[in-house]
Every structure is written in structure tokens, then in C-alpha cells.
Amino acid sequence: MKKNLLVLGMGFLLIGASIFSACTKEGPMGTAGSNGKDGSNGKDGTDGTASCIQCHSPAVVELAATQFELSKHGYGEAAFEEGGNVICTPCHTSQAFLYVCKNNIPATFTLSGTAYVNNYRTIATESLGDITCATCHSSLHTTYSKNDFSPLTTVAAVSMTMWGGTKEINLPADGGQSNLCVKCHQPRPFVNASTTNVMDYVELTTNPTGSAYDGTSESPNTTDKTRPGYRTHTHYGTAGAVFAGKGGVEFPGSTAYTNTAHTAIASCQDCHMGVQAGRAGGHTFNATGKFDGCNASGCHTGLTASSSPFWTTPRADVKKALDDLAAKLKINGVDILNRNPDGESNLWLASSTNKYDGYLNVYDPINNPNGIANNPAGTFKATGNTSSFSQAQKDINAALPTITLTNAQLGSIINFQLCLRDYSLGIHNYKYTMALLKNSIAILP
């Protein structure tokens, strides 16, 4: 009986499935209806190519990009080797530069526990990236038009890191565009070895006979302002400070600290970004051999590389002043400043007769292996940690004379480095350059 009921139930299911299947099957197609009314045409979209070629054309971006390849920002920047260094990268990598500008990072030192900390830094995650177009033109690809070239990343007044933010550079010409350059092209701070705060440069001028380093590296250090080593220096980008007439150790003297007209009426762009000529001008940022910026309306007339009053004479004056100051920076006939005849590593080879590079003549076989050979009158003993020296190098170091420095000598070293590494031999700011050098010469015995 149960089997019969099961068979009967299965039959009903099959019949039901057939009925439902038949109900869902489409019927025959009906007669076609009349066509509906056409809609209106849509609005044409924006031509993307037309927007791009406003900038990406042979005469605009392509030209600037080619010029940039010839610039030191393009091929010689230290972005790779400094990447990750939160102190150095604000001037060596794109992300770090944009970070300090966007966040208005102060160039101050603050006390943290028992030591001072340099606040002008980025963070590890924003410490990479080559210098590119967007480093200075941070609004690129915002509206996708020529308007994106400006505003520049910053034209604000620049707080000087060398002075821990107590001095400021603000160059007014061309809407402050030079401030963008000076943001990086400025000297770095000297740190007082005993206090760890920024060096008190004013004290160097008010107490010139005081001791900056007494020749003993006692621990803890309670007296020495510096422990001089080969790399005790202002770094390399001093041009902004000299151009602005700020930042030097201003010893009192007979030569007044004034500026040439360049400081008020000229901009970096006037001379370094003129019409391209060979490997100079435009976004090469190279001014070598170009005088169109000098010969602009309201400035000079007919100035060339052979012009005496405004080119050859002032440069010769500054070179002689550098030589005269170096001659006074000696101890028992031994140069305090380092000589380096190698034209590849010494960018300032031609700026002084004895080919000083701005470093100190202190023994450092790691970073300056040819130091003793390059300085025939002698080299001073290393004052810092020598644990990385081989035993033979330690033996050499032990036999070398000890260096000592007065405040006047330390301040004069700083001024020598500022004026040498300005790299213009006074053209940026002849009056201020000569005041620093002449008054430094006069303060030394």
C-alpha cells in the first residue's frame, strides 16, 4: 500500500512540474510598435589632450625637464644616500622638503631632558624621494592647467637653522621667489659641544680671546664650545645667507656690514634661470658664463666675464681676502684649514691660492685619507673618537700636534667657510663678504 502511494505522489510531482514549465514559456512575438522620439544629443566632454599639451609641450615642460637633467638637483642630489635621515633630508629629498614646508616646522632647538634637540626635521615616513618638478611646484596636476605652476611650494620668509631660528631671511624681489631657494641654500647650525644648544655666535665676537677649545677632550665636557674635527664646517649651501647679508660672525671692525643692491632688487631666478645658453640658464639653475641677468634693465650694462669693475676686480679682491684670512688661521706654521688639490672633490679649488676646501686640517684617515700628504706643513691630532682607526693610524695620530682654538679663530673659520662656499667670490654680495673677511683678519693676531 505504501509503495502505491509513493508511486502516486511521484506522478503528481511530475505533472505539476510540467504545468509550471508550460506556464513560464514565452509566447509568440507580437507586432513591432512604432519608433519612439529621439532624445537630444549629450554635451561634448572635455578634450583631455588639449588640457595636457598646455604644459606638456616642447616649449614648456619638455624643455624644463631637459634642462633639469643638466642641473645638480637632477643628477647630483644626495637623495639616495641621505634617504631616511630625518635631519638631512628636508634639503635632500622631495617628501621631506614638502613635509617641513606644509607643517611649518620651526628651525629651533628645544631642551629635551639634559640635551637640546634640533626641531628642524622630518619624520621617517616622509624622508625619501628624489628632487622633482613637484618639489618646488607642489600644485602640479591640481587643475591640469598652466595655473598649476604657481604658487610655488613656499615663498615665505626663511628661519635660519644656523641661528636656531633667531634670525630670518626674507628676500623681496620677484615676490619672494628667492626664499624658495634659500629654504635649503643656507648654512647649517654649529652646536655648542658642552651645552648641545646652538652656538652663541655673538659670544665669539664679544669675547674674542676666550677659549673655544683648550686642546683637552675631557669628559664630561664643561668648557669646550667645539671639539674640532676634519668635518667641523658650515656645510655647503651658504649662498642664501651671504646673498641676504645675514648669518656671519660679525666681529666689530672698520668695515661696515652693508649689502650690495642685489639683496634688495635681484632674485636668484634673475641670474640662475635666464634664457638657456648651453648648459646654463633655465631649469639647469647654472649661471656660469651667463650675464643676461646682470645686463637687465635697471642693473648693469655690457657686463662680461672680462669686465673689471663688477666682475674680475671684486672676485680678485675676495680671493685675496680669503688667502689673507687663511694665512692668519695657523698655529706654529700649521694650517688650521685643510688643503685639497683634487678638483673633483674640492668644488672651491680656484677660490684660494692654496686650494682650501673649507674643512679643517685635523687628522681623519677615514674621510680624508690624503690629508697628511696634502698639508706638507703638518696636520693636527684628531680630537674625537678614534676607535675606528687602525693601530697604525692611532700611532700616527698620537705623534701629531694638538690644535687649540680661541673664539676669534672659531668665528673666523666660520666666516671663511661661509665666504668660500658661497661659490661666487663675492658676486652675490660683495660688501657683506668683504666685511666678514676683513674684520675677521683684523681680529686675529
Task: Show where each model-derived region lies.
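Bacterial N-terminal signal peptides that target proteins for export
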Residues: 1-10
